[in-house]
């Protein structure tokens, strides 16, 4: 099995190294094509107005000056054009990609692009908690990653579907199994604008989340990782809402 690995945190990210190790538990034919720099939050964007610069880091490792989607396209259509990958793995992201995160996530977009190109694709992220970005439990993803991927592949991934995996913020032995769950939704009232002043008194702004009690919905990715379970969520490329489609057809028909 030929595996293409990408991410959105960049070619030097620790999570990418973790995912390479996970991939090598599954296959000895692993290729890495990742962004030259951190592309967190770029979603499914493409570099249409800038050229893509490709740098060979090692025999089967490449860095691209571009987005995660650019990287997957370069991997499938250029680097591996003679024989494409059988699986695209994107991650392991520093931080969870659950609920509406998936619409912003470059990690999820890497898997989405693989799906568009007809390759089975899985996005993987490692949640972190109060310890912050400096205390990510990468060993949890490393311990459970290959086993989780194997089970997903055994279950089968249909065309047009990608799989989003989130590992909880706990020690590997504290993981309470795998939960197949829906995409959740946060309380958007917690999203705030943090206004500050620079040294010259000019305002600048950060997006921030207010700290408040929030109860995630049952059967969601948010709830699963809160309960120390690995959240596995199938997502689809077709964003059509069928009930509304039917209702609109009756109204406008």
Curated annotation (Swiss-Prot):
Organism (species): Methylobacterium nodulans (strain LMG 21967 / CNCM I-2342 / ORS 2060)
Cofactor note: Binds 1 divalent metal cation per subunit.
The name this protein goes by in its record: 5'-nucleotidase SurE
HAMAP family, per the entry: SurE (MF_00060)
Family from the record: Belongs to the SurE nucleotidase family.
InterPro entries from the UniProt entry: SurE (IPR030048), SurE-like_Pase/nucleotidase (IPR002828), SurE-like_sf (IPR036523)
A Gene Ontology term for the protein's cellular component: cytoplasm
EC class of the enzyme, as a word: hydrolase
Catalytic activity: a ribonucleoside 5'-phosphate + H2O = a ribonucleoside + phosphate
Pfam families per the UniProt record, alphabetical: SurE
GO function term, MF aspect, one: 3'-nucleotidase activity
Positions annotated to bind a divalent metal cation: 8-9, 40, 93
Zinc-finger recorded as keyword: no
Function as written in the Swiss-Prot or TrEMBL entry: Nucleotidase that shows phosphatase activity on nucleoside 5'-monophosphates.
Cofactors that this protein relies on: a divalent metal cation
E.C. no: 3.1.3.5
Keywords on record: Cytoplasm, Hydrolase, Metal-binding, Nucleotide-binding
Subcellular localization(s) per the UniProt record: Cytoplasm
């Amino acid at each position: 099995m030929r595996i293409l690995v990408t991410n959105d945190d960049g070619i030097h990210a620790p999570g990418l190294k973790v995912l390479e190790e996970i991939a090598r538990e599954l296959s000895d034919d692993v290729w890495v094509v990742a962004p030259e720099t951190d592309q967190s939050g770029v979603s499914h964007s493409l570099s249409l107005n800038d050229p893509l610069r490709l740098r060979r880091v090692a025999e089967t490792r490449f860095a691209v000056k571009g987005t995660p989607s650019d990287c997957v396209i370069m991997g499938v259509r250029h680097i591996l054009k003679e024989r494409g990958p059988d699986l695209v793995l994107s991650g392991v992201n520093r931080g969870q990609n659950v609920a509406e995160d998936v619409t912003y996530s470059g990690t999820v977009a890497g898997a989405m692009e693989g799906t568009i190109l007809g390759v089975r694709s899985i996005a993987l992220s490692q949640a972190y908690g109060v310890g912050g970005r400096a205390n990510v439990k990468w060993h949890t993803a490393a311990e459970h990653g290959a086993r989780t991927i194997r089970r997903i592949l055994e279950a089968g991934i249909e065309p047009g579907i990608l799989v989003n995996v989130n590992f909880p913020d706990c020690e590997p032995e504290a993981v309470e199994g795998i939960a197949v769950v829906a995409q959740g939704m946060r309380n958007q009232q917690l999203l705030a604008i943090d206004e500050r002043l620079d040294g010259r008194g000019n305002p600048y702004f950060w997006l921030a989340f207010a700290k408040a009690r929030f109860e995630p919905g049952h059967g969601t990715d948010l709830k699963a990782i809160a309960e120390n379970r690995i959240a596995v969520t199938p997502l689809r490329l077709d964003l059509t809402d069928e009930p509304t489609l039917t209702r609109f057809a009756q109204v406008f028909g």
